[in-house]
Amino acid sequence: MTENTESPQSVATDIPEHKRRIKSFVLRQGRLSQAQQNAIDTMWPQYGLTLEDKLLDFNTLFGREAPTIIEIGFGMGNSLAAMAEAHPENNYIGIEVHRPGVGALLKLVAEKGLTNVRVFNEDAIEVLNRQIPKNSLSAVYLFFPDPWHKTKHKKRRILQAEFAEKIAQYLAPGGQFHMATDWEDYALHMMSVMSAAKGYRNISGEGQYTPRPDYRPLTKFEQRGHRLGHGVWDLVFERI
């Protein structure tokens, strides 16, 4: 996810708590391409999910019993589509607030003929709170979230202690929370938060980062970064 340089909105105190929560994103009104709009028009009825106050039944949703994985903030959907294509044995639910990314993913779903992907165009916290059963997920992926690198904005980083403990509630025992970032300061923050969070173990050992697992696609951005000597840090913590 690219760096966000917009100023965060002020937080009001006279509105409900779920609306006062400091959000990790600023909703930008990006323009959809015609192809993205067409994909939403044609694919959303089958693959799109609308936020409700009702827990999902994954077996009914996907028409089968299979491990279910959520990716939070899938960007333009390239990695999620690649994983779903490479691992048809898994179910994938993508959550993204930016509509062009939703359109881009649905376009890939159509092109690849994927049937194991469903999509929310919503705030991930709201989806978790209202629709995901506890102890149900095989994995949660958080790849390249906004680093909010300015000191005054770091409180907006999605990975905080409360969020880490929330994710643990939705993972099945043995389920994994996999994070990746290309900002070293955020990698250190992630390691600090996750090492202190209850209910997890670092699969690579205390304080250790994990080599990129084969299932996480190497992005074009990463490939360019590697050529320039830039680092990428993966962390994988298992619910115990």
From Swiss-Prot:
Enzyme class name: transferase
Keyword presence, tRNA processing: yes
One Pfam family cited in the UniProt record for this chain: Methyltransf_4
Catalytic site: 146
GO cellular component: tRNA methyltransferase complex
Keyword Methyltransferase recorded: yes
Keywords, sorted A to Z: Methyltransferase, S-adenosyl-L-methionine, Transferase, tRNA processing
Enzyme Commission number(s) of this protein: 2.1.1.33
GO molecular function list: tRNA (guanine(46)-N7)-methyltransferase activity
Gene3D superfamilies (UniProt xref): Vaccinia Virus protein VP39
Binding site for substrate: 150, 182, 219-222
Catalysed reactions, as listed in the record: guanosine(46) in tRNA + S-adenosyl-L-methionine = N(7)-methylguanosine(46) in tRNA + S-adenosyl-L-homocysteine
Annotated S-adenosyl-L-methionine binding sites: 71, 96, 123, 146
Function of the protein: Catalyzes the formation of N(7)-methylguanine at position 46 (m7G46) in tRNA.
Protein family membership: Belongs to the class I-like SAM-binding methyltransferase superfamily. TrmB family.
Name of the featured protein: tRNA (guanine-N(7)-)-methyltransferase
Organism: Hydrogenovibrio crunogenus (strain DSM 25203 / XCL-2)
